[in-house]
């Protein structure tokens, strides 16, 4: 995607106009000057503010929301770190190099090696800091993994309250610094533009507060305002896939991308898009709302059903143990969509497939919810569901032959029953992702860079704004979004030079 095309929708933020505004304000008055202006009070912005303030920096922290925390309010808060004190106390020998090797193995070497190296090298320091200040992981942690491809060593942690367990620690530390008078917090204050000088260096921000605009100047401007998961138009434009489910943080609107691109930054990472293996949504709206999820993890429930795409074809063995393999198999299916097909004998005998539902709840939903279809024959079931009838009939017949001879065409092992007794059932599953795969390009010092690799002076970025694909590649690697965001925010707060008065 060309930069010219991307910024067409935000031409009002173009560099010349913003530079002119900077010059007019500079002539008119001398506003407060901060050491740090941090745009976004979430997973990366909070540690940046805390650590900068602890050094004596004067910090302005801005957020469009009405509370600090960002996606930590919704996140599972999964972290990964190697060489932590908790690991040592439990006799677990681990290193950042082993962590790095695992990330590259799981991502098939698609994660950015520079940012990933920084993330794993800094992870233990970040995690130990949280633990020292009261973070409590679940008692059995660390673990190898859950919901994502497992690590080779136990380095995966989260708290009982998910992301809020992390936020509770950050909020306490943040309030200490705010009450000390070194952090100026402005909530419900979106940033409308970055201010640049004639040389292209970022000097401050323009904000909207109520019905009026203000400008603030600072030595370092940090963009930590998250991704674009709740901006359906930007999601499709950048990721190349539709935003099928509205399950993200409502303020993840891509504001940081617009701000950075308007002053010369660019986006990268489109090739790393990956969907999860699907959910049941409330309706056909795009984006839709989450309703439930069929248990498709064989470690939790062995499959009795078959999974078919819109052509009625199976596309992966249903008892495939690798979640990464399942997720990648869905990328090539039309609309990231598939159906879970079974019959009355399976519904009666198998453990209920929809997570948290009883068999009776499932029965009551067929014929009521559009994504739950039943019919007395496979052809009718297919037509009502949106599946090719001939394809489905052919697939079920082939599967049943495999059950009879004890050998499946795709290598599936668990095949307790054929699909033969009417009525027949189909439940639609929709793949989706709420994380921002694409993000703003930065260098090894987290400076926002132009396409020629040169840094934009005084402008930095961290968190999901960098794109999930930078530290995960084309995979979902456990803990490699939350922990890098925390660590990169901490690094920026610790290491950027301060003005002489601080």
Pin down the residues of each PLM region.
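N-terminal secretory signal peptides and thylakoid transit peptides that target proteins
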Residues: 1-13
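Beta1/beta-strand and adjacent pyrophosphate-binding region of the FAD-binding site
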Residues: 31-42
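Glycine-rich FAD pyrophosphate-binding loop
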Residues: 55-72
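Glycine-rich active-site loop/strand segments that organize a redox cofactor
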Residues: 81-119
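Conserved redox-cofactor binding core of oxidoreductases
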Residues: 119-212, 218, 232-233, 280-282, ...
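Glycine-rich loop(s) and the adjacent beta-strand/alpha-helix scaffold that form part
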Residues: 216-284, 482, 488-491
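An anion/pyrophosphate-binding glycine-rich loop and adjacent beta-alpha core
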Residues: 257-259, 263-385
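A glycine-rich dinucleotide-binding beta-alpha-beta segment and adjacent secondary-structure elements
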Residues: 391-473
């Amino acid at each position: 995607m060309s930069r010219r095309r991307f910024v067409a929708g935000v031409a009002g933020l173009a560099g010349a106009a913003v530079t002119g505004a900077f010059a007019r304000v500079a002539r008119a008055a001398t506003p407060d000057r901060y050491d740090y202006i941090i745009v976004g009070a979430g997973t990366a912005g909070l540690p940046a503010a805390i650590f900068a303030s602890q050094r004596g920096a004067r910090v302005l922290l801005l957020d469009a929301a009405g509370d600090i925390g960002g996606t930590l309010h919704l996140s599972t808060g999964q972290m990964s770190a190697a060489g932590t004190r908790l690991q040592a106390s439990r006799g677990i020998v681990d290193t950042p190099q082993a962590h790095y090797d695992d990330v590259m193995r799981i991502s098939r070497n698609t994660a950015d090696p520079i940012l990933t190296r920084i993330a794993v090298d800094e992870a233990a320091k970040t995690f130990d800091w949280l633990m020292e200040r009261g973070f409590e992981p679940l008692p059995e942690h660390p673990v190898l993994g859950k919901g994502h491809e497992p690590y080779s060593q136990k380095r995966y942690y989260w708290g009982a309250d998910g992301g809020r367990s992390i936020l509770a620690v950050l909020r306490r530390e943040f309030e200490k610094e705010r009450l000390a008078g070194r952090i100026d917090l402005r909530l419900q204050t979106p940033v409308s533009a970055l201010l640049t000088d004639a040389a292209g260096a970022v000097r401050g921000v323009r904000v909207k507060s109520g019905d009026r605009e203000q400008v603030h100047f600072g030595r370092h401007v940090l963009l930590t305002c998250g991704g674009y998961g709740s901006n359906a138009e930007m999601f499709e434009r950048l990721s190349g896939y539709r935003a099928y489910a509205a399950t993200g943080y409502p303020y993840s609107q891509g504001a940081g991308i617009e701000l950075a691109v308007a002053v010369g930054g660019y986006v990268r990472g489109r090739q790393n898009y990956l969907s999860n293996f699907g959910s049941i949504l409330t309706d056909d709206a795009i984006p839709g709302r989450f309703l439930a999820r069929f248990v498709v993890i064989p470690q939790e429930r062995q499959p009795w059903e078959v999974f078919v795409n819109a052509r009625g074809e199976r596309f992966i063995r249903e008892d495939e143990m690798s979640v990464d393999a399942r997720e990648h198999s869905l990328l090539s299916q039309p609309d990231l969509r598939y159906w879970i097909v079974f019959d009355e004998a399976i519904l009666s005998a198998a453990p209920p497939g929809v997570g948290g539902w009883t068999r009776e709840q499932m029965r009551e939903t067929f014929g009521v919810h559009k994504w739950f279809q039943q019919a007395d024959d496979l052809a009718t079931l297919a037509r009502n569901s949106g599946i090719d009838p001939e394809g489905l009939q052919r697939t079920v017949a082939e599967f049943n032959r495999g059950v009879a001879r004890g050998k499946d065409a795709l290598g599936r092992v668990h095949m307790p029953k054929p699909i033969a007794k009417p009525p027949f059932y189909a439940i639609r599953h929709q793949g989706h992702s709420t994380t921002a795969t694409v993000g703003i390009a930065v260098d090894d010092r987290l400076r926002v860079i132009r396409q020629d690799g040169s840094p934009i002076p005084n402008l930095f970025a961290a968190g999901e704004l960098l794109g999930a694909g930078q530290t995960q590649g084309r995979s979902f690697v456990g803990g490699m979004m939350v922990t890098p965001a925390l660590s990169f925010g901490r690094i920026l707060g610790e290491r950027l030079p301060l003005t002489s008065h601080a």
